[in-house]
Amino acid sequence: MLEELGYQALTIEGVAARSGVAKTSIYRRWQSKAEMVFDLMLHSSDELPPLEDRGSLSGDLDAIAARVVALVAGPLGRRIFPGFIGDAAGDPALMERLRNTIVLDGRNQITRVLERSVRRGELADTEAVADLQAVLIGAVLMLVLFEPEMDEGLLRNKIADLAMAVLSGGRTPS
């Protein structure tokens, strides 16, 4: 339904009608549309491929960019995130869940990638984890909101280049 209608047009009533259950059944599990969609996003993020060692910082950053783009800028993400972010921002409990799951899990994954790069001698430390995550997510959201027609492959390359720039003191690959 989300892919068909998008986040803004999705309603609890519509979900109940389509699934053949009472609206109260849905509200017993989720207090709002945003919570219901958040759980769907958690499920979707579980289906993303793991961040395996690609053998280089550049390869690992490309893998991170691919995951972020798949989640946020894939067909479903483009239909969810623009409306979801606004609703979530007005719900402190949901924002806390978002921070404690997607944000912290992402930060832990990025830390592991940067630790591998330190072991390979490509980076001196892992201090840029929070900055890197902010650039990755912020850039993808900005591009999804303001460049909605951008091809996923081009977006992934842009995000990987921005990530490399963060870690290399602002220099982008030639």
Q: What name fits each language-model region?
A:
Residues 1-20:
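Short, amphipathic alpha-helix enriched in basic
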Residues 3-7, 27-37:
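HTH DNA-binding helix-turn interface
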Residues 24:
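Key DNA-contact positions within bacterial/archaeal DNA-binding proteins
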Residues 29-30, 98, 102, 141-142:
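Tryptophan-centric aromatic hotspots in well-structured domains and transmembrane helices
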Residues 41-47:
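Short, basic, alpha-helical segments at the C-terminal edge of helix-turn-helix-like DNA-binding modules
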Residues 49-81, 132:
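Hydrophobic alpha-helical connector segments
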Residues 63, 69, 104, 108, ...:
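C-terminal peripheral helix-coil segments that are non-catalytic and often amphipathic
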Residues 75, 79-82, 92-119:
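Amphipathic alpha-helical packing segments from all-alpha helical-bundle domains
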